[in-house]
Design a protein with these regions (language model features):
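Nucleotide-activated donor-binding/catalytic signature segment of Leloir-type glycosyltransferases, i.e.
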Residues: 10-27
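Short alpha-helical donor nucleotide-sugar binding micro-motif in glycosyltransferases
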Residues: 34-39
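Aromatic "clamp/platform" in nucleotide-sugar-dependent glycosyltransferases that forms part
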Residues: 47
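Short hydrophobic beta-strand element within catalytic cores of glycosyltransferases
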Residues: 64-67
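C-terminal alpha-helical cap of glycosyltransferases
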Residues: 120-147
Length: 147
């Protein structure tokens, strides 16, 4: 199926990766910030994701994102990332980031904005507003029933 398509080809690449590609396996959490600080871009070509922590971790360090064009990302990342659906598209995104410092700076800033949106303080405020609004609506509903 779609998830396992190309598995054998990817397995061969993993066993004999290009010089600039390292498969690290499971990385302890305390080492993740160092890895993200070394990264120029977070590239996630997955066909299927939930809300991935890797993206939140990368945007906290203002790393530009190159992702597959999934509907989920549109809803949670607000087009603040580069996206494509095939190898040529991904290559073009990565080359733009590599060769155009203005494009790179733009997507660093987009990651910064995502980091602010998903900060603990902002998420807490969104939940607070949600619950206060729900409480207010329920109070109004109860008052209207009494009339």
């Amino acid at each position: 199926g779609r998830i396992t398509d190309g598995y054998e080809e990817l397995k061969k690449l993993q066993e004999n990766p290009p010089e600039n590609c390292k498969f690290l396996g499971i990385v302890p959490r305390e080492e993740m910030v160092d890895l993200y600080n070394m990264a120029d871009v977070l590239f996630v070509p997955s066909y299927n994701e939930l809300f991935p922590m890797t993206i939140l971790e990368a945007v906290n360090l203002h790393v530009p994102l190159v992702l597959r064009d999934l509907d989920l990302y549109k809803d949670i990342l607000f087009d603040r990332y580069m996206h494509a659906n095939d190898n040529d598209g991904f290559k073009n995104c990565l080359l733009k980031l590599k060769n155009d410092s203005d494009v790179y700076a733009k997507y660093q800033n987009e990651s910064r904005l995502l980091s602010e949106f998903y900060s603990k303080e902002h998420v807490l405020n969104m939940w607070r507003e949600f619950y206060l609004s729900a409480y207010k609506d329920k109070q109004e509903e109860l008052l209207n029933k009494k009339k």
